[in-house]
């Protein structure tokens, strides 16, 4: 087992932080966006097998958010097929639900976004070993990926499962569910596209509930939504969901439709 993750050391200087956009200036509004000044690429140790698998497969199945001004993705070229729905999962973690859901929606392109490299390495391993052909991965902050890498009305769905609740009041400004992010997601969704959010944190659920109608382009559909055009059953209990259930937390889910 390797004790170091040399790949990051070769490509990113010490203290490197992902590019951070001034969203209010970028979009010309005064909406609320996460303030993530302390966020950086999280380091972690990969096993030798994970490193070998990463080196062999990441150039094909993965992309890194960089300092380049424009990294727009050609989804059809990346997946090698045209005319298929595309769903973005923000904060895929170790990819447990991603890998479980993908085979059930093989006609849908799934793009998993995560900062933590060992989490992406686990998902990459599951994708390669399971011969899952409809998953691609991006290493970067989800809001920046939406801004820099995805054109308007390019997505059929966005999933945000168990985002960091940032429970301390002084950290609430870091929560991803904010008025500005909902506006950004709405702009990237096609009409009829679906936003699905799940949390096990009661205070965060209340926070989100106060925002369900804040974005005029999104129609809140509640939960469950029997006629939802996309898969909403996560199939497995994710790591963070399991921790919440162990503490008797209630899972609260939200669904919106792009008008």
UniProtKB/Swiss-Prot annotation:
Pfam family, one: Methyltransf_4
Organism: Corynebacterium diphtheriae (strain ATCC 700971 / NCTC 13129 / Biotype gravis)
Binding-site positions, substrate: 168, 200, 238-241
Superkingdom classification of source: Bacteria
Entry protein name: tRNA (guanine-N(7)-)-methyltransferase
Annotated family: Belongs to the class I-like SAM-binding methyltransferase superfamily. TrmB family.
Record flagged with keyword S-adenosyl-L-methionine: yes
Disordered: annotated segments: 1-29
Cross-referenced CDD domains: AdoMet_MTases (cd02440)
PANTHER family for the chain: 3-DEOXY-D-MANNO-OCTULOSONIC-ACID TRANSFERASE/TRNA GUANINE-N 7 - -METHYLTRANSFERASE (PTHR23417), PENTACOTRIPEPTIDE-REPEAT REGION OF PRORP DOMAIN-CONTAINING PROTEIN (PTHR23417:SF14)
Biased composition (Basic and acidic residues): 1-11
E.C. designation(s): 2.1.1.33
This protein's pathway: tRNA modification; N(7)-methylguanine-tRNA biosynthesis
Cellular component aspect of the GO annotation: tRNA methyltransferase complex
């Amino acid at each position: 087992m390797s004790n170091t993750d040399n790949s990051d050391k070769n490509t990113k200087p010490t203290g490197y932080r992902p590019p951070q956009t001034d969203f209010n200036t970028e979009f010309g509004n005064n909406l609320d966006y996460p303030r993530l000044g302390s966020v950086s690429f999280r380091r972690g140790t990969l096993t030798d097998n994970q490193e070998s698998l990463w080196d062999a497969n990441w150039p094909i199945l993965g992309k890194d958010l960089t300092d380049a001004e424009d990294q727009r993705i050609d989804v059809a070229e990346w997946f090698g097929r045209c005319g298929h729905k595309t769903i973005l999962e923000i904060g895929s973690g170790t990819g447990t639900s991603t890998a479980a859901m993908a085979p059930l929606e093989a006609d849908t392109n799934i793009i998993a976004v995560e900062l933590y490299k060992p989490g992406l390495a686990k998902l990459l391993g599951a994708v390669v070993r399971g011969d899952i052909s409809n998953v691609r991965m991006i290493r970067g902050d989800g809001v920046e990926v939406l801004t820099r890498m995805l054109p308007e009305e390019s997505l059929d769905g966005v999933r945000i499962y168990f985002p960091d609740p940032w429970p301390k009041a002084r950290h609430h400004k870091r929560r991803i569910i904010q008025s500005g992010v909902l506006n950004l997601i709405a702009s990237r969704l096609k009409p009829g596209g679906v936003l699905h959010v799940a949390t096990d944190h009661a205070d965060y659920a209340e926070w989100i509930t106060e925002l369900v109608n804040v974005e005029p382009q999104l129609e809140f559909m509640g939960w469950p939504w029997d006629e939802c055009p996309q898969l909403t059953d996560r199939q497995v209990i994710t790591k963070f969901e399991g921790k919440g259930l162990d503490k008797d937390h209630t899972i609260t889910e939200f669904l919106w439709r792009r008008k």
